[in-house]
Amino acid sequence: MKGIILTGGHGSRLYPSTLATNKQLLPVFDKPMIYYPLTTLIENGVVDICIITNPNSTSNFKKLLGDGSHLGVKITYKVQKEPNGIPEAFVIAKSFLNRDDGVALVLGDNIYYGANDILTDAFLNFGSGATVFGYRVEDPERYGVVEMSGNKVLSIEEKPKKPKSNYAIPGLYLFDYDVIEIAENLRPSKRGELEITDVIKAYLRDDSLNVFKLPRGTVWLDAGTSSSLFDSSAYVQAIEKRQGIKIGCPEEATYNQGNISKTELRKLIKGIPNCEYKDYLSNILKYE
């Protein structure tokens, strides 16, 4: 499976912090925001990743992540000139995708924690069609909502006034190659954008849409506003301080996946300046 991280847009909800930088380069506690979705993909076996960003941010992402080789992955960069909606990512990344591979799309400001088994099951067993996830929320009318029976989707609604369930669809999706044709044939909504809900509904009409319910205790954070960015940082800090582990650490994730060797991790650590992050990575080798 290949992966796409969507980091386009203007980050207007985080103005003025995003005047000089891309939203996904802002810190969520102790690391750049993009580290979190990148780690989600790596933890679930994805090693071929496309980062789609706006025209002004490519060089900064390349400075941060390079071609991914130090992490044992391959990172490709493509540009979304205007924020025309999530589905445009599949059109932009058409040359990156292969017919025989599924693709995982994760939004660059989304953070997931505590659902590793469910996500890994969904990634490993993905064959065709599309897979979304259901996350229980208190206020489903603010989200795209999935009504389900087991792993079968009954309906999809976008910000319904009277939701049929209290399960929102977070910004992580699995699709087969057909998603490109579906995205290419979409028409903009009243907002003037292509809508990911319309892509999902196309699979629902074809009876090829599955859903995995994220279990109780799973954390899904959207760090796309000033308040949610602060809350996300506070949550990550609390977990890391209490448990002594890092959330969203791609170096640790890729080492655990076997993408880099112990020698390669040591070399990577050597290139990091003296800091708490370096100490954490060093302790991975020290205490294993």
Model-derived features: positions:
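Conserved donor-nucleotide/metal-binding helix-loop-beta segment in metal-dependent transferases, i.e.
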Residues: 114-141
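Short, conserved catalytic or adaptor-binding loops enriched in Gly and charged residues
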Residues: 66-72, 147, 202-204
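A structural signal for short hydrophobic beta-strand segments in well-ordered beta-sheet cores
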Residues: 25, 146-148
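Generic C-terminus detector
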Residues: 255-288
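Short coil/turn connectors at secondary-structure junctions
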Residues: 1, 46-47, 72-74, 99-102, ...
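Conserved N-terminal catalytic core of the sugar/cofactor nucleotidyltransferase
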Residues: 2-5, 13-16, 26-27, 31-107, ...
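Catalytic-core segments of class I nucleotidyltransferases/pyrophosphorylases
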Residues: 104, 120-124, 152-252, 256, ...
